[in-house]
Amino acid sequence: MAELFYDADADLSIIQGRKVAVIGYGSQGHAHALSLRDSGVDVRVGLHEGSKSKAKAEEQGLRVVTPSEAAAEADVIMILVPDPIQAQVYEESIKDNLKDGDALFFGHGLNIRFGFIKPPAGVDVCMVAPKGPGHLVRRQYEEGRGVPCIAAVEQDATGNGFALALSYAKGIGGTRAGVIKTTFTEETETDLFGEQAVLCGGTAALVKAGFETLTEAGYQPEIAYFECLHELKLIVDLMYEGGLEKMRWSISETAEWGDYVTGPRIITDATKAEMKKVLAEIQDGTFAQAWMDEYHGGLKKYNEYKTQDENHLLETTGKELRKLMSWVNDEEA
């Protein structure tokens, strides 16, 4: 069973006694920086010259400096820029500013797990990753609650890495809800697998295949959209609240029977075998290297896939249908 840690297990004074740099000010960056600041921590935000986020961070009362200045000032450096550019930011702005006893923090383990960033031996390498988007992390903190976090230590140069990670997690409200101890390897591999096989890749492919099956059989795209995409939220919300049990308790017996007898025909042993191949490609670094090559090679295939799906009948149908739904915010669609 997982080890869980709460407020009583974490000493906030540890992180309060350090100087923290949050590199990046996106979804997670703003939540970490503001919540740490409100927890009495000395925080600065590191942003590159010309960053659009600088004005927002300063308006919210944070001091903004360049990433290299932030790294030079701080002894705890949390890297929260996108995965593909973390290694570049590290090499250009952080590496030469690290001192023995410093701590390098991450919100996701990809660059450490696959060796794109190789910290020196004298620094702690830690992870604190809230299991929720930044806006939720910040809102829960302000309301006196928290979002569960996972925490890990890859390199414990000082012998105090996990205590520091717990203290950091407490500073953003994580220990109010609970912190699960993990490893960089476990977090990275399971996170990538979940995204690819279930949450994003698996779900998107399932929705598209179902929609195409109905429309190719002559059913109206609008009806197919409702049945294969729109109503997915209703089911996922029930699963989110109470697992498969609550979902099955809430649906009709007809739907539940269809779940039992048809689900295994869609997700077959062959599907699971392919999932195992996907996991193996994550574990051996094939996916990570391919993604880095794609990103730094100009994102040609990425943009082709993106454009192809943007023009899919599912998407064009959905954009029109969502105009009928006053409760749906489709401003960014």
UniProtKB/Swiss-Prot annotation:
Main function: Involved in the biosynthesis of branched-chain amino acids (BCAA). Catalyzes an alkyl-migration followed by a ketol-acid reduction of (S)-2-acetolactate (S2AL) to yield (R)-2,3-dihydroxy-isovalerate. In the isomerase reaction, S2AL is rearranged via a Mg-dependent methyl migration to produce 3-hydroxy-3-methyl-2-ketobutyrate (HMKB). In the reductase reaction, this 2-ketoacid undergoes a metal-dependent reduction by NADPH to yield (R)-2,3-dihydroxy-isovalerate.
Positions of substrate binding: S252
Enzyme class: oxidoreductase
Cofactor: Mg(2+)
GO molecular function: ketol-acid reductoisomerase activity; magnesium ion binding; NADP binding
Family of the protein in this entry: Belongs to the ketol-acid reductoisomerase family.
Gene field: ilvC
Protein name: Ketol-acid reductoisomerase (NADP(+))
Binding locations of NADP(+): Y25, G26, S27, Q28, S51, S53, D83, P84, I85, Q86, G134
Species of the source: Streptomyces avermitilis (strain ATCC 31267 / DSM 46492 / JCM 5070 / NBRC 14893 / NCIMB 12804 / NRRL 8165 / MA-4680)
Cofactor annotation remark: Binds 2 magnesium ions per subunit.
EC number: 1.1.1.86
Positions with a binding annotation for Mg(2+) 2: D191, E227, E231
